[in-house]
């Protein structure tokens, strides 16, 4: 049985991804940082269909990530798939931002992706196989007003992924990006109904996305059907960028 590690799996897109892999027969490692109760809910839902564990890990801390990798290896053996869903946002004018705001976003979004890809990537290199899917955002492709730092962090993930795909490809490891559009999660719950309506009207499909929309694409990129796809960015945005 294959094993997937999902960061940011306590809720939102990460939880949906964990459930998708559970339904596909994977062992699932639910990585969370803050909310034990949310992680426990994810674990309860995922454990109904597969073997799963929850591991507390601050992805910006390399020692935490090392510990998570060791726990995963002892519990399940190899790591076959890594999905980096852990992320934070910060909405404000750039001129009002602080160094701490910048560090908060980049430490989780970019440094976290770097740490997990580096340490899980070592395990995948030993096995000469693996799939890595990093979650970015359409703001990493186009940029969002009042989200310059967040957009930059998500753009960095895209550039990082493209480079890593070239680095790991000769060893049978695929590395891709999923760039969600407006997805209905806790991160977007404070967006006004007026703005939501504007987003729906400007997208080709005329609706907002769900975590399950993203999870389905992630599942495809982890499957054998995507063996010849690497270094790519797939937007899951209802045609908003089209």
Language model: regions and residue ranges:
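Active-site helix of classical SDR
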Residues: 117, 153, 161
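C-terminal substrate-recognition "lid" of short-chain dehydrogenase/reductases
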Residues: 129, 173, 207-236, 241
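Alpha-helical segment proximal to the catalytic Tyr-Lys
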Residues: 122, 166-170, 227
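Conserved glycine-rich Rossmann-like NAD(P)H-binding loop of the short-chain dehydrogenase/reductase
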Residues: 24-41
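Substrate-binding pocket helix/loop in short-chain dehydrogenase/reductase
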Residues: 93-94, 98-106, 188, 199
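Residue(s) in the substrate-gating loop at a strand-loop-helix junction
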Residues: 137
């Amino acid at each position: 049985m294959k094993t997937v590690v999902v960061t940011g799996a306590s809720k939102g897109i990460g939880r949906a991804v964990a459930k998708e892999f559970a339904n596909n027969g994977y062992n699932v490692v639910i990585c969370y940082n803050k909310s034990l109760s949310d992680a426990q809910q994810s674990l309860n839902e995922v454990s109904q269909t597969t073997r799963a564990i929850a591991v507390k890990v601050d992805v910006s801390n390399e020692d935490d990530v090392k510990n998570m990798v060791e726990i995963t290896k002892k519990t399940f053996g190899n790591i076959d798939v890594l999905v980096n869903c852990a992320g934070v946002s910060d909405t404000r004018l750039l001129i009002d931002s602080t160094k701490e705001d910048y560090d908060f976003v980049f430490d989780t979004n970019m440094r976290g992706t770097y740490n997990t890809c580096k340490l899980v990537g070592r395990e995948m290199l030993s096995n000469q196989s693996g799939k890595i899917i990093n979650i970015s955002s359409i703001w990493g492709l186009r940029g969002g007003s009042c989200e310059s730092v967040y957009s930059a962090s998500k753009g960095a993930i895209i550039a990082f992924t493209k480079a890593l795909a070239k680095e790991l490809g000769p060893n049978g490891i695929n590395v891709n990006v999923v760039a969600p559009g407006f997805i209905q999660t806790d991160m977007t719950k404070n967006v006004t109904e007026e703005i939501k309506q504007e987003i729906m009207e400007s997208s080709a499909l005329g609706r907002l996305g769900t975590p399950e929309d993203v999870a389905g694409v992630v599942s495809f990129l982890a499957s054998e059907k995507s063996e010849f796809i690497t270094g790519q960015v797939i937007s899951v945005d209802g045609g908003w960028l089209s």
